[in-house]
Amino acid sequence: MLNRWRWPSLASALSPAPGWGSNGWVVSSGMTESKGAYLALDRHFAFTQPCDWYLVSLKCPSLHLAGAAMPGVPGVVNGRNDRIAFGLTSLKVDVQDLFLEQFSPQFPNKYKTPTGWANAKEIVEEIPVRFSSSLVLTSNLLHKVLETRHGPILIKNDENAVALSWVGLNQPEKTISCAEAIYRLNHSANWAQFQSGLEHYAGSPFTFLFADKDGHIGYQQAGSIPERSTAGKSNKFESCLLNPGWVGTGDWVANLPFKDMEHAFDPAEGYYVANFRQSRTEMPLNLNVYRAQRILNVLATYKKNAQKPGLPEMALLQGDQLAPLAPLVKRTLAEAIGKTDSIDAFQLSALDSIGKWDGVLTENSSGAALYESFIRTVVRRILEPRLGTNLANEYLERYPGWSQVVERILLEKNSEWLPSEERTFKGFVITSFGQAVKDVRLQSKSDEPSSWKWGDMHKIVFESELLRGAPDLAPLLGVLNGQSVAVGGDQDTVSSMESSLRRGPEQFVCRSGPTMRILIDLSDSEKFYQTLTLGQSSNLLSNAHADQLRSWLTLKPLPIAFSPALEEKISEHRLLFTDR
């Protein structure tokens, strides 16, 4: 709509930031090399500068905290205190619903409900304007909002409107905000206090991870998870695209009680991995399953082989780049193309390159470049004829599990899904591979497959927040974005590096990933490591602007000063507050 009104810059600024979930896991003391509990976490956000996070150590007579904080949020969001380590990852459940409302053409503020007509609430919001004054002919903005029983109206004509229900609106009494929940976590010393601090949290749901100095681990889901009227629906957690507001179908009737949310203390496995489906199978979760499955497999292998991993192994796992669909893609290509004479020598050379590939998406791999181009070509050729280019772009950018569609296509070989110009699955694979090779060839500007590198196509640009709201100024102020950085991985690897699927110059550009990594071993206060993408400072001329980038790229995390000895050793400056 903003594009239609010729405000493309504003549309870009208000568009949802990329990034799907985060990685997080805890390991109990019985499984670790140090005999202390581990917490490993990497939070996924858009790659920007300055970074969304800053590292801090806070100490007062009754409390010592260290870890990653966010501007405007008091305390530490992911980190530790003297007794426990804590972190959180987003829980991707449906927390927003849209309702179609019927309004009376004779009485503009009356809308239809299951029991008859009701009056919409009219609210006037005053938006402060800086330097507003009658002297300069400016004043605060007044904006009228209509609100139905479902929530505020987003768009309306004479007889119909769309209302938004969201968990952040109209919270019940005796609930606390996310900032208050984090404050309580910061002061928790054990599992009971950890759970108690989350019990009344209301807002977007998260999975909160726990580890303590006694070797215990746990997790607790918390937040507002709406339960819906099940009339005509498969289950109470499932959302519809657009609910008829006058019927009652899909109305929010309650929130899932805290006692019924998934949690565990010292799980029998000896570890827990966030963002993976647990026992509540009826709750739809918008997940990329491959990353969590890979972490689970690695931890399960350690346990099966009676190996005791240390923090270095956890750091390597955070940077894991194994492509989950590599065996399937290689087998599919070999079966379809290896038995045909319909491809040229150039494509055979590319096929040989991907056949010899080890399945790891390193930045220097030619096989990785071909793999990425192929799976993107497959999903686009399936979706675009049915959805159109624009809607296919929206789907691929908003759905983190699009590669699961590719997996299903390659496994089932269902001819009904093929584009109209294809008659057989084999022919579809051959032409898709040909297009994938062509795309890599154009991106790499080379005719030699052995010279192609995934990192040459897959680069991060740390976009300045100043330019995100005004992309039209990029040609003039693009220097604020800094240099691009080649990376491996993709959206499916543990080292999650999500890239654009849009055709054109932005294709393969890496847009989001782990903007912060944390590793904590609670057996030793000096075994606390954390790394940001760039650095602590937003000043382009500061030595601290990008001094962590090399450590972040090479998976060599930096120590965080928590013990007095390490604090004295690595600190350059200290800010001391007194009561005088």
PLM regions and their residue ranges:
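C-terminal/peripheral segments of proteins
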Residues: M1-R580
